[in-house]
UniProtKB/Swiss-Prot annotation:
Protein name, as recorded: Receptor-like protein 6
UniProt similarity note: Belongs to the RLP family.
Record key words, sorted: Cell membrane, Glycoprotein, Leucine-rich repeat, Membrane, Receptor, Repeat, Signal, Transmembrane, Transmembrane helix
Any coiled-coil regions, as ranges: none
Chief localization: membrane
Domain of life: Eukaryota
Gene: RLP6
Keyword Hydrolase: no
InterPro entries referenced in this protein's UniProt entry, alphabetically: Leu-rich_rpt, Leu-rich_rpt_typical-subtyp, LRR_dom_sf, LRR_N_plant-typ, RLP23-like
């Protein structure tokens, strides 16, 4: 028995020993095989030496937001005497020791990636990540196509440029491809061969799960073949300049979890009827031309966590079927055309943290359905039509950090419970009708508040002490414009927030410069406009180191305290001093200023040559001062950057200098109301961005500038009250009209000749309907608009902003002859037509009846005959008509707009009559009875008529003499008031101002 036990024991020990030996050998062999092959190591070391180490300042995403990316040089760990399989960013195959993975993302690499790079000797690579480096705009080498085992390729945000080689599409094993960058449409962006690349991509990459080509210039439509990429789980095509209509079927790919089509403004499409069991988690269609409604089938997206459809053209109501999206955390529908009320079913979205429906046409009261969503951190309902009161129970949203209800019609007071939400960092209630300041004193409870916007409401009942905001130590932005403020308790020693960057106190009844501002070292923008501040601008203002935007307009300031040396060396880029009482010579603004507005002051002297030292001015407005002398020729140096030059209403003389050769961005030039002479400079023909040209009320002596019709954006042309001469029709060449002109005022010059019947055929902008409310020269920054003075309805009218819908043709006060062109009838969007004080003949064209938007028609002081076309009686928009002093005959049209006019609108036309004229003008235009036709000859009739006239004159002499003596007595004995009360009619009088 003992022998058997010993034999068994020996047998077991032998087996254990053999197993242990085998395990050790396998482990040793494995360790040996993990070692990096020398050729792999050498290739990597050569690759390391191809680049310099570069430490980036950061990376921006496509929206310009700084990304949370940390970079460090991974290749620093690569040394010749170590195993490359253990280097940072390297993965090796456990059996062969070949390099299969290379992750050098965020590795501070700087230099060109050349086609002969040693990288391409690593033939066994399955994953390559070179994201967040700087390959200095080198093309993506086609040699990547040699990596036939490659499954993942990430070259994002690494400064590649040029055409993407179609050879990359040979990598048919790819499951993830990221070629994105942060700068769409830039010269250095990547691009593809259109349209072949996308077709082959869809056909070759059937296994692809993730595709990101953001900021790659695709500039074509997405082919229907993308719908067959059933393995896709993530598709990101931001900022690719996608065109055409996006295939709905792509949104229905069964396994698709995330799709983003943001920043493709020309991409059209609509949301499909979503199927059940859809896998979508994130749907982002932002800044596109997608339209249509949100379908009720949105409820089938049971797993959706983020829905972003902002800045597109979606419309209709927000569907109540959103209630089914129980996992939704982000809902962004801003900047669309949604209407109606927010559905109560929104209250079911218990996971919602972000809710943004700003810039739509929503209405109703504050959406109470939001008050039950206690996870909400962000609410933006700005720029809608909400009314009523803000809810008193808003404090239920205890996690709220951002709340903005700006630009609505909320009334009443700010709910006191709002000040219990201690997590609030942003509170925006500007541009409403809030009128009760009672609860504003509780604002001090919001210790975390960084942005407070209460401006432009109706807070006028009582003053608010500015010191209630002293406790808000984290404030960065404070806007209180329109709130009457008391600053008596605020001194330079008051401990206001030291973080303040933006301060808006316009229209706050402030009478002196707030002293606390002098300690705001981080302040970059200040608005003290529309107050009653008198005296001088304190010198300490210019010493604020970060100050860049200053608006002091519409006060009573007369000058500056102390030297302006600090101003000239400041960072200020926008300075608005308009509508004050500044006097003396014009000072030199900071060289880096971009917006300098000094209009409506008393600046005198010459425009100093030093103004030509400005680096890149965009807007220069010195209008309505007392400047004289010449316009400096050295301004030519500024024309490459100037967008607006306004020198209106000064005493400038000489000629308008020929300085516009490089004025490629000049959109508005106004030198009206000076004493300029000579001709218009020919260099204006190169101002391809010019929208407004106003040279009114000068002494310019020139012919009509036909060459201006080559300007592609010219919309306003005012040559009024100069010495222009010649014809308005280019008889010596082809006349193309002015396709974009909306306002043309060439009145009170010396234009002659006739206008052909097709004269207005190419005035396209006044022929087509304009539906969108826009302003000509609508600014992107600082709210600067060009104003204009025009004649309308017989009076001078100033427009502070020029609407694109407002259209004018004013040829009055010239010597134009012939017929009014029949083509005037195609100008269906024309609002004002003034052809008065010329020598037009012929008839009033019946085509005027097509001008259904016409408000003012003046053809007085001409030689026009015939009848007023009865069709004009249908022009319901016509408010003011003047056909006086012509040779018109017949009845006036039947229409209330003709019956409302003063008698002066018809005088000087003894041949016109009408039933309504008797009420307006008395018996002089009473309806004429039908005259019987006598059988004798016309000659005898004429002689008889002459005889009857003499008899009537004699018979009327005696009673007429009596009547005249009686009237003389009445008027000279101060009884004319009795006479007018008894027999006369008081009439309104149009006042002409200029």
């Amino acid at each position: 028995m003992t022998g058997l036990y010993s034999s068994m024991s020996f047998f077991l020990r032998t087996i254990v020993l053999l197993f242990s030996t085998s395990s050790f050998c396998n482990t040793f062999a494995s360790l040996t095989q993990d070692s990096c092959h020398p050729d792999q190591r050498d290739a990597l070391l050569e690759f390391k030496n191809e680049f310099k180490i570069w430490y980036p300042n950061g990376f921006l995403d496509i929206d310009g937001v700084l990304m949370d990316v940390t970079s460090y040089p991974k290749t620093k760990s690569w040394t010749k005497n170590s195993d490359c399989c253990y280097w940072d960013g390297i993965t090796c195959d456990t059996k062969s020791g070949k390099v299969t993975g290379l992750d050098l993302s965020c590795s501070c690499l700087h230099g060109r990636l050349e086609p002969n790079s040693s990288l391409f000797r690593l033939q066994h690579l399955q994953s390559v990540n070179l994201a967040y480096n700087n390959f200095t705009n080198s093309p993506i080498p086609a040699e990547f196509s040699k990596f036939m085992r490659l499954e993942r390729l990430n070259l994002s945000r690494s400064s590649f440029s040029g055409h993407i080689s179609i050879k990359l599409l040979q990598l048919t094993n790819l499951v993830s491809l990221d070629l994105s960058s942060s700068f769409p449409y830039s010269p250095s962006s990547l691009s593809i061969e259109k349209p072949l690349f996308l077709h082959l991509l869809a056909l070759n990459f059937m296994n692809l799960r993730e595709l990101d080509m953001s900021s790659v210039d695709i500039s074509s439509a997405i082919p229907i073949e993308f719908s067959y990429m059933w393995s896709l789980r993530s598709l990101t095509l931001k900022g690719c300049n996608l065109l055409g209509r996006f295939p709905n079927s792509v949104l229905l790919i069964p396994n698709l979890e995330s799709i983003s089509l943001d920043h493709n403004l020309n991409l059209e499409g609509s949301l499909p009827n979503f199927l059940r069991n859809n896998s979508l988690l994130k749907l982002s269609i932002y800044n596109t031309s997608f339209s249509g409604t949100i379908p009720n089938s949105i409820s089938n997206l049971k797993h959706l966590t983020s829905l972003k459809l902002q800045q597109s053209a979606f419309s209709g109501r927000i569907p109540s079927s959103l209630r089914s999206l129980s996992h939704l955390s982000n809902l962004v529908l801003s900047e669309n055309n949604f209407v109606g009320e927010i559905p109560s079913s929104v209250s079911n979205l218990k996971q919602l943290t972000l809710f943004d429906v700003s810039d739509n046409n929503l209405n109703g009261n504050f959406p109470s359905s939001l008050l039950n969503l206690n996870q909400l951190r962000y609410i933006d309902i700005c720029s809608n039509h909400f009314t009523g009161f803000l809810p008193p129970t808003i404090s239920q949203l205890s996690n709220l950090e951002f709340f903005s209800a700006c630009d609505n019609s909320f009334t009443g007071s700010i709910p006191s419970s709002l000040f219990n939400i201690s997590s609030l960092t942003t509170l925006g209630l500007s541009y409403n009708q809030l009128n009760d300041t009672t609860n504003i004193k509780n604002i001090s409870l919001l210790h975390n508040l960084q942005r407070l916007l209460l401006d432009n409401n109706n807070f006028k009942a009582s003053q608010v002490d500015l010191d209630v905001f002293l406790s808000l130590k984290r404030l960065v932005s404070l806007a209180l414009s329109g709130i009457p403020l008391s600053t008596t308790n605020i001194t330079s020693d008051s401990e206001f927030s030291s973080h303040l960057e933006y301060l808006e106190l316009s229209g706050c009844n402030i009478i002196e410069f707030p002293e606390f501002i002098r300690n705001q070292r981080n302040l970059s923008s200040i608005d003290l406009s529309n107050n009653n501040i008198k005296g001088q601008v304190p010198n300490w203002l210019w010493r604020l180191p970060e100050l860049s935007t200053v608006d002091l307009s519409n006060n009573s300031l007369i000058g500056f305290n102390g030297s302006l040396k600090a101003l000239s060396g400041s960072k200020i880029v926008m300075l608005d001093l308009s509508s004050n009482a500044f006097q003396g010579p014009l000072f030199m603004p900071p060289r880096g200023i971009q917006y300098f507005l000094g209009s409506y002051n008393n600046f005198t002297g010459y425009i100093p040559p030093s103004i030509c030292g400005l680096a890149n001015p965009l807007i220069l407005d010195l209008s309505n001062n007392n400047l004289h002398g010449l316009i400096p020729r050295c301004l030519e140096a500024q024309m490459s950057s100037l967008s607006v030059l306004n020198l209106r209403n000064n005493s400038l003389d000489g000629s308008l200098p020929n300085i516009f050769m490089n004025a490629k961005v000049l959109s508005s030039l106004d030198v009206s109301h000076n004493t300029l002479e000579g001709k218009l400079p020919a260099s204006l023909a190169g101002c391809s961005a010019l929208e407004i040209l106003n040279v009114e009320s000068n002494n310019i002596n020139d012919t009509f500038p036909f060459w201006l019709n080559s300007l592609p954006k010219l919309q306003v042309l005012v040559l009024r009250s100069n010495n222009f001469r010649g014809t308005l029709h280019n008889v010596d060449g082809v006349w193309f009209g002015f396709p974009l002109l909306r306002i043309t005022d060439v009145s009170h010059n010396d234009f002659v000749g006739t206008l052909p019947s097709d004269y207005f055929m190419n005035w396209t902008a006044i022929s087509k309907s304009e539906t969108e409310l826009q302003y000509i020269g609508d600014p992107e920054d600082y709210g600067y608009y060009t104003s204009l003075v025009l004649m309308n309805k017989g009076v001078s009218m100033e427009m502070q902003r020029i609407l694109t819908k407002y259209t004018v043709i004013d040829f009055a006060g010239n010597k134009i002859q012939g017929k009014i062109p029949e083509s005037v009838g195609i100008l269906k969007e024309l609002h004002v037509l003034n052809l008065s004080s010329n020598a037009f003949t012929g008839h009033i064209p019946s085509s005027l009846a097509n001008l259904t938007n016409l408000e003012s028609l003046d053809i007085s002081q001409n030689k026009i005959g015939g009848e007023i076309p009865p069709e004009l009686g249908t022009l319901s928009s016509l408010e003011w008509i003047n056909v006086s002093h012509n040779q018109l005959v017949g009845s006036i049209p039947q229409g209330t707009q003709f019956h409302r006019q003063n008698c002066s609108s018809y005088e000087g036309n003894p041949g016109i009559y009408g039933s309504s004229l008797k009420d307006v003008c008395g018996d002089i235009h009473a309806p004429r009875p039908p005259q019987a036709v006598l059988p004798h000859s016309s000659s005898s009739s004429s002689e008889e008529d002459e005889l009857i006239s003499w008899i009537a004159a004699c018979l009327g002499f005696a009673p007429g003499m009596v009547f005249g003596l009686t009237m003389g007595y009445i008027m000279t004995s101060h009884k004319h008031e009795w006479f007018m009360d008894t027999f006369g009619r008081r009439k309104g009088r149009s006042t002409r101002t200029r």
